[in-house]
Amino acid sequence: ATVAPVRPVVHQPVPVAPVHRGRSGPVVPQSVTSGVPVDQRLGDSEYHFSWRHDGSKTYTWDGANQYCGNLGSGWQGISIETRQEDSLVREAITEDHLPWIWTSGQLKNHGFAWASGEEFVGLNWSHTGGNHRPQPDNREGNENCLGVLNNVYDDGIKWHDIACHHDKAIICEHKVRVHG
């Protein structure tokens, strides 16, 4: 079966980044390079929260990461490489009362990897899951994608390996290249 490409539908965003007031109302921060609505910035990255711009749609892992790629050059699912980025994710999930989101994390060659290509460090794996075992546990036998779940197993906002066919929203990330 042929799968149609996922095209992001951009609605009026509700930014968490500072909003400036213009003559006609709030001015939503935009990516400095692509014009994509940006919900948060941290270091050299910009973040776009899919649920704030697509009518709260959810996607399989492939569809979610395709959504990010369709935002434009350099956009991909979030790679949680620092504790600060993990905190940004947890704050977004808490503030918007989300049950879960996808990341770019995917199992490759017997270990998880980020789309960014940066070293994968398991900063926030859950201590439990559906079988009460620490994550990643590959409980369903095909849990090859990394999601962040909001207290699903009474464990707080933690990382879980999940089968990629489940539907979730995603945080998209764009690294800003600063020319000096």
Segments predicted by a language model, with ranges:
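Acidic glycine-/aspartate-rich tracts in secreted/extracellular proteins
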Residues: 82-85, 95, 107-110, 120, ...
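Conserved hydrophobic ligand-interaction patch in extracellular adhesion modules
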Residues: 61-107
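Surface-exposed ligand-recognition segments of extracellular binding domains, strongest
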Residues: 99-143
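Disulfide-stabilized extracellular ectodomain repeats and their linkers
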Residues: 58-61, 65, 74, 86, ...
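Short, structured beta-strand segments at or near domain termini in extracellular proteins/domains
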Residues: 160-180
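Extracellular disulfide-stabilized recognition modules
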Residues: 14-73, 180
